[in-house]
């Protein structure tokens, strides 16, 4: 094997190791510092509720016209932010149920925002939403992944729930069926 090919393989292995280590480190810290709610069932077993809310000052994303937009300044009651990518199969599979979940709630009370992380251009996102008939969700972009990195998102899909006072109250890493009864009940409980 020649040196350029060997160098590429070594570099690929180093990046894979870093990616795996970063995800496992984050998962361990999430499990040790967070707790699940007593009696969680079904898909909500995957949700980690923070023991202390985590303050978030800004959520800067790009709109379709490439202008910056701060999600924290919109005055929603509860925000579910879903980080995803068009190339991420689990993201693609969960998106229709996420769209259905938004249809069940007044968007001024519970707002579901999707943020395409990484190299997802607006045309590709728009085509994806059209092809999969996603009509209830707003889409934004985090093209450099800087917001995802700032929030400790190292795998996709990932979702965080933000309270009206701007604090992250919990997160979920991985796909779920967003219209399972336990999930819907959880979001209904946030409105009480």
Task: For every predicted segment, state its role.
Residues 1-60:
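N-terminal targeting signals for export/organelle localization
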Residues 58-79:
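A short beta-strand-turn-helix
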Residues 75-78, 108-111, 136-137:
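Loop/turn elements at helix/coil->beta-strand transitions in domains of secreted/extracellular proteins
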Residues 77-79, 83-87, 155:
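Short pre-active-site segment immediately N-terminal to redox-active cysteine/selenocysteine motifs
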Residues 80-81, 112, 159:
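Hydrophobic beta-strand anchors of alpha/beta hydrolase catalytic cores
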Residues 86-93, 158:
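C-type cytochrome heme c attachment motif
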Residues 93-132, 143-149:
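Structural microenvironment flanking redox-active thiols in thiol-disulfide oxidoreductases
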Residues 127-135, 141-189:
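Thiol/disulfide oxidoreductase modules built on the thioredoxin-like
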